[in-house]
Amino acid sequence: MSSVFGSVHILAMIAIQLLLTHSVSSLNLTNAYLHHKCSNTQGKYKQGSAFEKNLNLVLSTITSIGNFRDGFRYTEEGEDPNNVFVMFQCRGDSYWSKCPPCISTAVSGLRRRCPRNKGAIIWYDQCLLKISSVASFNKIDYENDFYLSNPNNMSDRGLFNKETSALLEKLAYKASDRNNLDGKQLVLYAAGEKRIGTKKVYAMVQCTKDLIFTKCFECLEGILRKFPQCCDGKRGGRVFGTSCNFRYELYPFLRN
């Protein structure tokens, strides 16, 4: 099983340092590029091919009629061998009108960074976008993850790790609760805060909405196991996958 976990550690430190220089209000408005991956296993499509036409149709459609109310859409176009599957997910506090700008940015960013790739993923601060020639609905992606961490450490690392992990685990249970609904739809997102000594930790967890609640918890459980590798004693950190992610900081980073 391959993974890109940890492959952007240098980028992580630079990105976090830049983010920390912004005010809280500015952070809430940023949509920084974080990472991307172009699939080498799915190959490339030819210009003017049926796959390209299907992809163009889907990408132009999702930016105009996407389900921005809940910040998620999974759609497909075409027939085998030219099937195109596209998924986008906006951050839990970036639904409705806050979602379309991120998706539009992601579409142009993915085209520029992974030209003609049949499979690709791009992450921004407020959304992710995935294109593929392979169906992935309700399937956890275990192969594509990475982390960003604050280069600065807490003084009491042991206590901080224990309490932050407990907060994230609590949020994972809440996000994947089958009774955590918006109407009839699973929310698959939770945010919270906790005081640890003199500091307050703010955190969130989220799954993509193609997952059922049991798959959501399974995904979150998997990335939370990477907390020691990502975030041991760090003042802030996040682990991103395609199917789920978590983040914590010592400052508010979510919209109300």
From Swiss-Prot:
Its main location: secreted. It comes from the Eukaryota. CDD domains: Gnk2-like. Residues 1-26 form the signal peptide. Residues 33-136, 142-253 form the Gnk2-homologous domain. GO terms for cellular component: extracellular region. The keyword Repeat applies. It is found in: Secreted. Pfam families: Stress-antifung. Keywords: Repeat, Secreted, Signal. Belongs to the cysteine-rich repeat secretory protein family. This is Cysteine-rich repeat secretory protein 42. It comes from Arabidopsis thaliana. The gene is CRRSP42.
